[in-house]
Amino acid sequence: MIILHLIHRSLNMLINTSNNLLITTIHLLSSIGAINWGLVGLFNFNLVTLLFGSFPIIVTIFYIIIGFCGVYSFLYLGKIFCKPGIKNVK
């Protein structure tokens, strides 16, 4: 039940911030990175290396961007779980 509640709030957060292209892109890239690591863990299949394997610098840059997006998404969780009356999370 808690997991469904978290999924519901996360989806609402994506819908409510869809007008902010940067935030939506950050969450999308974080999700792609999570799916890629899930594929690596389950099937030892790295989609990023498959797509950009012949260009190692692009793979490195992609992972750095995904890392920054993940950190931002983690910090952005405060806005998801704050009380409705609170507007600024410090």
Swiss-Prot record:
Disulfide bonds: none annotated. Keywords: Cell membrane, Membrane, Transmembrane, Transmembrane helix. The keyword Transmembrane applies. The keyword Membrane applies. It comes from the Bacteria. It is found in: Cell membrane. The chain crosses the membrane at residues 23-43, 48-68. It is a multi-pass membrane protein. One of its GO terms (cellular component) is plasma membrane. Pfam families: DUF378. InterPro entries: DUF378. PANTHER family: MEMBRANE PROTEIN, MEMBRANE PROTEIN-RELATED. This is Uncharacterized protein RP169.
